[in-house]
Amino acid sequence: EEAWERYGSHPAFAGWYLTQEVGRLQWNIIEVFHELGKFCKELSGGLPTAISPYIEGIQLYDPFRTGVNAGKSVTLPDFEREWNEIMAGITGCVDSISFQDGGCDYSELEDFLSVACYAGKKHGILINTNVEAFDRDMPIRFLPIKWDKMLLKLRAAEKAGVAGATMFEFSHFMSPNSSYFQAHGLNRCYQHYLAGGFEK
């Protein structure tokens, strides 16, 4: 309510991001997304709502365990079943879902996003990818991702049929003003890609 009272009249206030990030059907998340999304829509006259869950795959970083692989990767059939159930329960309250792409292996990303897109069409929810611009394959947490890995993820998302892409996190990992030297090169490669380079 406070955010709406302060900023709701600004033209830049175009919708809501529900910040609860989950990867699976857990913690009464259907009720949380349903109630929060419904509240935000009613408060703002129907402005769109979005969530950005992660794919709980082999690359998922668990700060409470040693190593990157948390040892609890979701299978594709379980992902499909759980997200169908979640989407069925939040239809009309959540308009778009941007799946964080860093949790699963590159070879599995297209399959997970394809399943998500199919479920999204079934339930009337727009599916996007949330491209993580940092590298999970390095012993240091976290450095800007190599361009060829980002391109691989963008192409997998395109093949899966996502509606669009968002990114986490531009200012640290891809900005030409970032303190990470690697971010400057990543930004140049991405600009070249947008201009039609690298044979989209």
Which residues are covered by each model-predicted region?
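Glycan-processing catalytic domains of CAZymes
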Residues: 1-200
